[in-house]
UniProtKB/Swiss-Prot annotation:
Solcar repeats lie at residues 9-95, 101-214, 226-318. This is Mitochondrial substrate carrier family protein R. Belongs to the mitochondrial carrier (TC 2.A.29) family. It is found in: Mitochondrion inner membrane. GO terms for biological process: coenzyme A transport; mitochondrial coenzyme A transmembrane transport. Keywords: Membrane, Mitochondrion, Mitochondrion inner membrane, Repeat, Transmembrane, Transmembrane helix, Transport. Pfam families: Mito_carr. One of its GO terms (molecular function) is coenzyme A transmembrane transporter activity. InterPro entries: Mit_carrier, Mitochondrial_sb/sol_carrier, Mt_carrier_dom_sf. It is a multi-pass membrane protein. GO terms for cellular component: mitochondrial inner membrane. It comes from Dictyostelium discoideum (Social amoeba).
């Protein structure tokens, strides 16, 4: 049993609340996530006007569902991922953290819980990235501005679930698994992902707990609990801090995951270690490339993390109240 507030919460509740909160949060910002992935694997700079143009042309070429291409794979991954993440974090926090006010201990619990979720669900993240990268005009040019999306090429049929008529088997890369080994197939990019999970989850969880701890009375109810709007905002800010700390590793991860897929075929193969890949990107494209897409990422961080933190705690409170009545 874990403890949520002053109420004991069973692992089944944390699993369900964690999974549902992740699905709701990720589905809300799926269009921005797809655009971010497209920019991360390109060498061209962008502006908010080009982001708008890219989204408009995706809708034109693939329909509105094109903005959610890859979201079905995201949902299949995010439910178990978020469920494991929250349950692992709660278990570690309530069984191994001796001082709930210790940001260092919360940092470690958050990082370990996040890493557990990554290890168990990583292949689905690779598939999602490759599906999102595949978009309708098969243009090998590295530029992704709106002009290059205005193609006369007949766009592929987009399925109702938003994935698009793509070769799922190719995205999974069974042949790569057989011929290249575990870490070069569907596990490509796992190491930078794990490296990035340490600052991302550690900073995110420790910041959120700190913000809740220092919440003024004006943001607490009569029971002394932090109110929803404060959780929403503090969760978003905490997520933004974590993303900033981990973002260069996220860019490296996406480059490694998508090398040779979709429009990523035009990008130089990155088969080195994480640090060498990061240095290669920095050397060829500059420091900006390691933070490519971070501004659009900030736009989605507040709703994603805010909704996730708020939804998770709200669902835990709801399920606990129902169980206590029985």
């Amino acid at each position: 049993m874990t403890v949520h507030g002053n109420t004991k919460t069973s692992p089944m509740v944390t699993l369900l609340a964690g999974g549902v909160s992740g699905v709701i949060a990720k589905s809300t910002i799926a269009p921005l996530e797809r655009v971010k992935i497209l920019y991360q694997v390109k060498s061209k700079m962008y502006s908010f006007n080009s982001v708008y143009g890219l989204m408009k042309n995706i809708i034109k070429n693939e329909g509105l569902a094109g903005l959610w291409k890859g979201n079905t794979a995201t949902i299949l991954r995010i439910f178990p991922y978020s469920a494991i993440q929250w349950t692992s974090y709660d278990y570690l926090k309530n069984n191994f953290v001796t001082d709930k006010k210790s940001s260092v201990q919360i940092f470690i619990a958050g990082s370990l819980g996040f890493s557990c979720a990554i290890l168990l669900t990583y292949p689905l993240d690779v598939i999602r990235a490759r599906l999102a990268l595949s978009y309708s005009n098969n243009n090998n040019n590295n530029s992704i501005n709106s002009k290059n999306l205005n193609s006369s090429t007949q766009p592929p049929k987009v399925l109702k679930n938003g994935i698009g008529a793509v070769n799922i088997e190719k995205s999974i890369d069974f042949n790569g698994y057989k011929t290249k080994g575990l870490f070069k197939g569907i596990w490509r990019g796992i190491l930078p992902t794990l490296y990035g999970s340490i600052p991302y989850a550690g900073v995110g969880y420790s910041s959120f707990e700190y913000f809740k701890r220092i919440a003024p009375d004006s943001f607490r109810n009569e029971k002394g609990d932090v109110i929803g709007i404060y959780k929403l905002i503090s969760g978003g800010v905490a997520g933004g801090l974590g993303q900033t700390a981990a973002y260069p590793l996220d860019v490296v991860r996406r480059r490694i995951q998508t090398t040779g897929y979709g429009d990523g075929k035009g990008v130089e193969n990155l088969k080195h270690s994480t640090l060498k890949t990061m240095f290669t990107i920095f050397q060829k494209e500059g420091i900006y490339a390691l933070f490519k897409g971070i501004s659009i990422n900030y736009i989605k961080v507040i709703p994603t993390n805010g909704v996730a933190f708020l939804t998770y705690e709200t669902l835990c409170d709801y399920f606990n109240s129902k169980l206590n009545k029985n």
